[in-house]
Amino acid sequence: MKYFLLFLLTIALTACSLFGRYITAKEFGAAYPFTVDGYLECEPPGAIVFKGGGKVYAVNGTAENKGYPKIDPIWKDDPTNPGLKINIGDVLTEGRKLCKP
């Protein structure tokens, strides 16, 4: 029984990382749009979420429609364009890759 529970735990932890990856400011450089590093994940059917700073945020409209809060609290302002945010396109592209089987 103990081995069976260990097996189930291993499967569950593996499944959690199948559709996600850790992203960082170091990886993206100045183009990194968030104030914290964290996990970018895809939840079927195409909801891209970001887990960072102890919370889960919607990165796209599909995730917002599933009830996740907007990413705005951790989305950096663009220092070269006052009133705008840093482009989130590269993160969306990476998220879409995670959504493909």
Show which residues each predicted segment covers.
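Cys/His-rich metal-chelating microdomains
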Residues: 19
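Sec-dependent N-terminal signal peptides
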Residues: 3-13
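Short N-proximal segments of mature Sec-exported proteins
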Residues: 22-65
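Short, intrinsically disordered, charge-biased short linear motifs at domain edges
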Residues: 2-3, 28-31, 84-86
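C-terminal partner/receptor-binding element of secreted or periplasmic proteins
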Residues: 68-101
